[in-house]
Amino acid sequence: NQIATRELRDIFGASIFTSPKPLKYLTRYLQIGLNKDSLVLDFFSGSATTAHAVMKLNAEDGGNRKFIMVQLPEKTDEKSEAYKAGYKNICEIGKERIRRAGRKINEELEVKNEKLDIGFRVLKLDSSNMEDVYYTPQEFELQSLFNENVKADRTNEDLLFQVMLDLGIELS
């Protein structure tokens, strides 16, 4: 779609995605099909047009819609404009679009909306934060209770999210 390609070029300054969805039409579909507090799920988010449309619609009508974008980190072609611009996979393009679109929406607002949420959190599917530690009763010693069982590259936030998920607590 030429309109969608032009919209993305305006945001990034280059044609970095081959088949974006048109923002205008997606915004209209969401406006018709959702209420102001809906949750939108896009399992093939690509360049994150859906997230852009949700933020735009919230800015226009004061809604409180949320979005979940899901995208496999498909690598960008090394000869592509996206790769040359530093985007090694599609997820990076989507995240940057959400950042840029959010800033642009905020700048274009005639009256600042303090309640407008343009932030987002990135969650990645990964292995457990805990080391695989197995003891048989014969091997167990009380001193082993003090051993560090958290993988070295994990953050406190990683641990928090794992515990929340294990306990069935919602992440937002």
Task: For each feature predicted by the language model, list its residue ranges.
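A phosphate-binding catalytic loop at a beta-strand-loop-alpha-helix junction
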Residues: 38-57
